[in-house]
UniProtKB/Swiss-Prot annotation:
Pathway: Protein biosynthesis; polypeptide chain elongation. CDD domains: S1_EF-P_repeat_1, S1_EF-P_repeat_2. This is Elongation factor P 1. Its main location: cytoplasm. It is found in: Cytoplasm. InterPro entries: Elong-fact-P_C, NA-bd_OB-fold, Rib_uL2_dom2, Transl_elong_fac_P/YeiP, Transl_elong_KOW-like, Transl_elong_P/YeiP_cen, Transl_elong_P/YeiP_CS, Transl_elongation_fac_P. The keyword Repeat does not apply.
Length: 185
């Protein structure tokens, strides 16, 4: 429990209505000298934003997330199946939680997941992954227009720009935050 006056942007709180991320906090003076805390909250499982007012001395339950290491196994229907490496339980994570991270997934990739009350709320990929090139442009096709790079399709289906010496079958290191080529492995 924390005082509402200690809330800050980015914190998660748990209320009777659900789990929320604090998106803004402001202190407001009341009519009789009492102050209250005006907070904008975004539901953790949707984009719905609500505003709540708390007395400055009111206690609020801070949500304590657990970070778990998961290994990707495979796609089943609309969910991604992961193995929790801590307790060896299988977890299904829906597409909405994965967002665009699924573009980098292949069997065996280890990710970090934020879990609250045994529900996964976010998944973070490693910053760098090694993926195999499954298709590339011919060097002459795009080099003259793009300054010495060509398109490459990776084994997961994502397309990146690579130097002309990268060929089909090469394994390359990719920055998952920017989707950029780093080096040939």
């Amino acid at each position: 429990m924390v005082l509402s006056s200690q809330l800050s942007v980015g914190m998660f709180i748990s209320t009777k209505d659900g789990l929320y991320k604090v998106t803004s906090v402001s202190k407001v003076a009341g009519p009789k000298g009492e102050s209250f805390i005006k907070v904008a909250l975004q539901a953790a499982d949707s984009d719905v934003v609500i505003e709540r007012n708390f007395k400055a001395t009111q206690e609020v339950k801070e949500a304590q997330f657990e970070t778990r290491t998961l290994e990707y196994l495979y796609l089943e229907d609309e969910s991604y199946l992961f193995l929790d490496l801590g307790n060896y339980e299988k977890l299904f994570i829906p597409q909405e939680i994965m967002k665009d991270n699924f573009l980098f997934l292949k069997a065996g990739v280890t990710v970090s997941a934020m879990v609250y009350d045994n529900v996964v709320f976010s998944v973070e990929l490693p910053h760098f992954l090694e993926l195999m090139v499954s298709k590339t442009d011919f060097p002459g096709d795009s080099l003259s227009l793009s300054g010495g790079v060509k398109k490459a399709l990776l084994e997961t289906g994502i397309e990146v720009m690579v130097p002309p010496f990268v060929e089909i079958g090469d394994v390359i290191k990719i920055d998952t935050r920017t989707c950029e080529y780093i080096q040939r492995v």
